[in-house]
Swiss-Prot record:
Glycosylated residues, chain numbering: N202, N236, N929, N956
Subcellular location: Rough endoplasmic reticulum membrane
PANTHER family: MEMBRANE PROTEIN CH1 RELATED, SUN DOMAIN-CONTAINING OSSIFICATION FACTOR
Region (Disordered): 112-303, 521-550, 582-607, 719-777, 1152-1171
Residue stretches in coiled coil: 910-1010
A Pfam family the protein falls into: Sad1_UNC
Keywords: Coiled coil, Developmental protein, Endoplasmic reticulum, Glycoprotein, Membrane, Osteogenesis, Phosphoprotein, Signal, Transmembrane, Transmembrane helix
Lineage top rank: taxon: Eukaryota
Protein name per Swiss-Prot or TrEMBL: SUN domain-containing ossification factor
SUPFAM superfamilies for the chain: Galactose-binding domain-like (SSF49785)
Biased composition (Low complexity): 121-145
Biological-process GO terms, alphabetical: ossification; positive regulation of collagen biosynthetic process; positive regulation of osteoblast differentiation; regulation of bone remodeling
Amino acid sequence: MKKYRRALALVSCLSLCSLVWLPSWHVCCKESSSASTSYYSQDDNCAVGSEDIQFQKKNEREEPSNAKVSEKSNSYLTISPEENKLKDDYTVDECKIWKQSKLSLPVVEALPTVDSHEESSSVVVGSENIENSSSSSTSETSPISKLDEIENSGTLSVAKPGDTEQPEADCDAGEAADADASVEQPAFVSAPESLVGQHIENVSSSHGKEKVTKSEFESKVSVSEQDGGDPKSALNASDTLKNESSDYTKPRETDPTSVTSPKDPEDIPTFDEWKKKVMEVEKEKSQSLHPSSNGGPHATKKVQKNRNNYASVECGAKILAANPEAKSTSAILIENMDLYMLNPCSTKIWFVIELCEPIQVKQFDIANYELFSSTPKDFLVSISDRYPTNKWIKLGTFHGRDERTVQSFPLDEQMYAKYVKMFIKYIKVELLSHFGSEHFCPLSLIRVFGTSMVEEYEEIADSQYQSERQELFDEDYDYPLDYNTVEDKSSKNLLGSATNAILNMVNIAANILGAKTEDLTEGDKSISENATATTEPKMPESTGVSTPVPSPEYIIKEVHTHDTEPPTSDPPKESPIVQLVQEEEEEASPSTVTLLGSGEQEDESSSWFESETQILCSELTSICCISSFSEYLYKWCSVRIALYRQHSRTVSKGKDVSPQPSLLPPVDSVEVSVLQPPSGNVDKEDMERELETVALDDLSSVHQAHVRNHTVDTVELEPSYPQTLSQSLPLDVTPEMDSLSTVEGSESVKSEGGHKPSQVMPQESSVEFDDETEKKPESFSSVAKLSVIYETSKVNEVMDGPVKEDIVSTHVVTKFPETKFPETVAPPPINTAAVPESEGMETKPSLADTLKHVVTPVTDPSLPEVKEDEQSPDDALLRGLQRTATDFYAELQNSTDLGYGNGNLVHGSNQKESVFMRLNNRIKALEVNMSLSGRYLEELSQRYRKQMEEMQKAFNKTIVKLQNTSRIAEEQDQRQTEAIHLLQAQLTNMTQIVSNLSATVAELKREVSDRQSYLVMSLVLCVVLGLMLCMQRCRNTSQFDGDYTSKLPKSNQYPSPKRCFSSYDDMNLKRRTSFPLIRSKSLQFTGKEDPNDLYIVEPLKFSPEKKKKRCKYKTEKIETIKPADPLHPIANGDIKGRKPFTNQRDFSSMGEVYHSSYKGPPSEGSSETSSQSEESYFCGISACTSLCNGQTQKTKLRRGLKRRRSKVQDQGKLIKALIQTKSGSLPSLHDIIKGNKEITVGAFGVTAVSGHI
């Protein structure tokens, strides 16, 4: 326990610090000392939540700790255990919620759960306190707001502004707000049913961003309650609620990119697409910024322009032709009530008027002021742009009223769309029928209103510059803010919408304001009449449009009830006039309102005050009426009850009295018809404007009762049958409806001629109804009072006598043609009831027929007229508004077929548009196209410039890249060229080398071939020489062998010197020893000698005794042969000698030299002979004669030695070879050349070297 207490204290301190640092999370309010305990208890519970957060990882310890902490917190409280339980449960959850707002979702999942059963029980216990809690706190804090808090928990956002302000509101509410707040905040986990039941409305109202219906919210709460035991499930439920709330908010979110800006950087749109986008954007801007700038500000000026009477003598109009019986035809073009065109009724009356200038016809006015005469009933109007012509375009058949006032017939743009735009200058009028049975049918006045070419140009020009002339808006408050917005939405482009708005405004102005100008010219009576005419259409519009007043709905119901009522027979003329069921029903409701305020002028003044207040509060009607919602409901109920009572009375009276009660129900029907047209199309502002004018007219009527009576009549007269066709706009519709009802009423009154007593009954019923309603005058709203004003004027007129009767009859007639004929004829009423209101145009003819059949027995005087109408087709067309409407359309179709063959051609070539308008339209179109094209081109230029800049940048980048690549390519090319040049150089070198090699190879081949040839030749020569040598050798050897063998002694002993000498002498051989013979075993030659020289060295051995016997010989100087060149090694070895002999001593020492004594001829000296003998003796060879020839050869030998010293080596080699040979046989030539053999002398032991022999 101590550990838990310490932890609890620590956690409480941390929670207090966190609350101090973040006061927006501090939900608890401490306002007094009494609330301090709950404050601390909540802090402790918050501490519990923080402790759970700190010890989140220890899941096994969370639940016991929470339980213990809750017990401890309960011990601190001084409140009853039930309250403690309640507060503990919700404060813990509250702290969890606030902690969850700063924790992530996984952290939130670890929080401990709260028992849903305990919560529900605690809620039941404290339900009373909860119900009594302040509504502000409940409205401010709701499950949805908690969901928002949880939804924003990830970003540590505490709460929404409304949620952060909750503590102050709770504190203001009182001390109980603490518990209430704690109860309300955790409602997303498990919301108590009591809270759900009580505060759903507050939730839906307080949270405009997230509106949830009660059923949806309860279903969500039930889901959350089912999952209340599990925190994860609770979180899942909250997630689902978040998703659903986001889904609720999605539909109201506006996509900022819904209107695509014309500037798309990526794609350049075409001119048409761009133009459409720009026009749409401009249209939206104009509608959002200036909703009333679509034609309102300049409407009055346009109306004044259009109020020119182009059939007036003042401007140059004249009568071109007329029936021959007509007198003073030009009088109808003069604004003088005392002048008139006179015609007997029996003749066919017609006339042709040339207008001042070509115009677009907008309205006709016709009047007959003469008392004792028949007024025109039906007349046909034809138009043409040239005269004379045999092709008149039938504009239509118009139905007048039996009234001696100006009757206006404005042309509906929808119905007369084929003709309104045509510029015509000639009008032909044919009177088809008339009211009454007087002899003369005079005509006092005819007016033609329209738009000339210049006016049309000015209108369109002004309409295009409305946005630029905002300073004029303040001048015209009569026009509503939303005036003509519907038309602008329907129009395809701004120009078309402007033109349509202008034309519609012109027509509306002609219908509404045109009467005032006419009144000014005519006088007080005409003024009052026109005023009332204008007020009637406005009255029903105002009543139908006002939001707080539910009169239109009730009026619709009323209409249906009237349809079901038993009909009473009415005069036939009245029924056809009121053929439009919708219009009649719509008119009936205003008449009912008028009946309520009929008898009192005080009601008029009060209604005036109400109208003023409504005009001033036109923009704040909802605000003005919120405070009096209960009053509004009370008044609405009272009005409905009064109308129901009146309706029931009229039904009963109609059953009692067939003709008269029939008049009563028509009064109601008139009322309905007046109210319903505005309910369909009229705007609030239109109502306000009309109410304003109505109030003004009513004031004038209050001051002039007589004028009022006339005005009532005029009101009934003005709406002619053409108006029954719904005019182009809501404003047009309501005046048409009213005028129709009034016209029909007037016709019915005239037809009813002598039924005035029957009309008194409806007046009385209306008075009674007024009395009943007077009991509850406060119950009516301002709109109802305004209508009361209008009706009071009518009541005053009714009080005047016959005029009143006429009015009542008109109401009756307009109200129920349907209810009257069903009584008489059962099938027709069934058909009319079965046919819907939308098919009113089709049902009208049938209604008219039935009315004729029913009415004929009722009114005797009207029978002949009805028969006349039925007899002629034109009259049949003119029977009534319903029948004439259908016939009128058929007639219009026929006329268009006759005139054009195709109605669409009217807008084509046959339709003549003014030169001004053609030029203006083309100029405007060109201006628009130029401006748009200029903007488009400017935008294109900007885009083009941007694109060009981007392209230039890209181009520069590409250029840089190309430059880099080119530079790199150039470098690569340079390197490649260098490599190529290097390779080329190497190739040239290679080619040169190859060429040189080829040349050298060729030369080598040549040399080789030459050498081969030389070798071959040398070989051949060698072979030849060898052969020759062999042959010579063979011959020489054979010869030498023969000679030698033959000449040599066969004994082996040497001959004696004497014998030898003798033999020499015998052979006569003369020899000369050039060299002293050296007796030695070897001899070395160092020089070279010619191979032809033969050196024979023979060792001679003589005994000393023989030496003595020898003859003396002459000693010669011994010459030593010195080699000029150094000794070279010989192949077979060196010549071996004892010692080289250098001088005589050496030479002598080596052997003894003997000089042969030659006995020469006597002529020679003894020395010579001795020498010769010695030589011969020495030689002893026959073949060596040249060596022993004598001393004559000595010099020659010396010279030869000198010459041949260069050849010593070769000779030495040969000598070596010869010396070394030891064999006794003679070497061959080959052996001698190679030096491989030693030549010896056989047995003699003398080594001989033989050269070339």
